[in-house]
Amino acid sequence: MPAEIQQKITDGINQASIDGNWMHQWDHIENHQYTIYNHRPEAEVTGDFYTWHTDASDRVQPNGKMRKLSSTIQLSEPDEYEGGHFQWIEPNGLFDKLKSTGTQTIDVDQYIQTAPFSAKEKGSFIIFPSFVHHQVSPVTRGRRISLVSWYHGNPYV
């Protein structure tokens, strides 16, 4: 990746950590992942997707670091695909509800956030803490392409 593009990404990650009041310290970038989601009308599930997951793990990587921040940069034009929405579960509201209800069943759907349409614009940049649950909904037409990255730092203490 050209140095000037990597610098713009690094600046964006640092600013998001400040703006989001996350203050995650990081000093290592994992290899970027070029991700293609295709519409597959012949398949049982008609489009590529990632189901709910986090990018973080309790495991420390061989380099002594762990994932702290994640990002995705949109490489497709918005009219090149349908579906493929980036979604996340708003952690604070859900965790507060879990604490107040104990073992009661909770409708998690009310805590799901969907990135605005502007996030589908080519070049849009979504940055979030790696522990946030997120997914990409199935692509229902065309092809969605993104560049995904993870930023490592020392384990939390």
Role assignments for model-derived ranges:
Residues 1-127, 131-157:
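Fe(II)/2-oxoglutarate oxygenase catalytic core
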